UniProtKB/Swiss-Prot annotation:
GO terms for molecular function: ATP binding; ATP hydrolysis activity; ATPase-coupled phosphate ion transmembrane transporter activity. It comes from Pseudomonas putida (strain ATCC 47054 / DSM 6125 / CFBP 8728 / NCIMB 11950 / KT2440). The complex is composed of two ATP-binding proteins (PstB), two transmembrane proteins (PstC and PstA) and a solute-binding protein (PstS). This is Phosphate import ATP-binding protein PstB 1. Keywords: ATP-binding, Cell inner membrane, Cell membrane, Membrane, Nucleotide-binding, Phosphate transport, Translocase, Transport.
């Protein structure tokens, strides 16, 4: 895992040109405008997501991090008044293109939410839920086991698969939700502050799991914890808020390798944020 940078605020003269990752872009996300009704939540944000990397989204509350994340697999379609201008290119196709089924999009771009949300059913059925929904024809037991192993949970629950997922601890519930997400073998995992409701020990387990999972998946992570971004993210995108005429619109300030963002940010606004001058 990444170690925290010792110098989080450097002068413009010290800033070096960022080293751009050579990993291929899995998702090219051009978010021109995102609306909820007449309210513009996000503007002018271009966010490339690279294969087998963790891309962290950081920024103050209300800057649109979660709105951006939920736009990547069309979860925001479920919100009344949502409107999207731009494109999200994934596997050679715009997920907002005409005729694209958002349910199919979410099959390939899975999501784990801030609060662990296991269903009121057994551990096994929680993991098998998406497989059954997608009419999986293979060995369900093997696939569930594989997903639980991938989420580093199998050894803890293998003897109680018929027990309710709600009986697990908070950290175990979040790993169960991750197992449920990876059971359908998505290409991309979207994690919306997955550790915010967890204690430090459970947080460490999930962070270790994220680093392990990126070997097989591409991950986008929203986090309020800058130290978490330093520890796990390969690339970090910093968002801020434009406040005008009583409204708050989020936008991307800069994006680059995590070490560069935290040690040598190009923008003064980024430097001010990571040094604690505003939050």
């Amino acid at each position: 895992m990444r170690k925290g940078a010792s110098n989080l605020n450097v002068s413009t003269a010290q800033r070096a040109a960022p080293m751009v990752s050579e990993a291929p872009i899995v998702m090219d996300c051009k978010l021109d405008k995102i609306f909820y009704g007449n309210f513009m939540a996000v503007r002018d944000s271009h966010v490339p997501i690279r294969k087998n990397e963790i891309t962290g989204f950081i920024g103050p509350s209300g800057c649109g991090k979660s709105t951006v994340l939920r736009s990547l697999n069309r979860m925001n379609d479920l919100v009344k008044g949502f409107r999207f201008e731009g494109h999200v290119h994934f596997l050679g196709q715009d997920v907002y293109g005409k005729g694209v089924d958002p349910v199919v999009v979410r099959r390939y771009i899975g999501m784990v939410f801030q609060q662990p949300n296991p269903f009121s059913m057994s551990i096994f059925d929680n993991v098998a839920f998406g497989l059954r929904l997608n009419r999986y024809k293979g060995d369900l037991g093997d696939r569930v086991k594989h997903a639980l192993q991938g989420a580093a949970l199998w050894d803890e629950v293998k003897d109680k698969l018929k027990v309710s997922g709600l009986s697990l601890s908070g950290g175990q519930q979040q790993r169960l939700c991750i197992a449920r997400a990876i059971a359908t073998e998505p290409e991309v995992l979207l994690l919306d502050e997955p550790c915010s409701a967890l204690d430090p020990i459970a947080t460490r387990r999930v962070e270790e799991l994220m680093v392990e999972l990126k070997k097989d998946y591409t991950i986008a992570l929203v986090t309020h914890n800058m130290q978490q971004a330093i520890r796990v993210a390969d690339t970090t995108a910093f968002f801020s808020v434009d406040i005008s005429q009583g409204t708050r619109t989020g936008y991307l300030v800069e994006m680059g390798p995590t070490a560069q963002i935290f040690q040598n940010p190009r923008e003064q606004l980024t430097s001010d944020y990571i040094s604690g001058k505003f939050s």
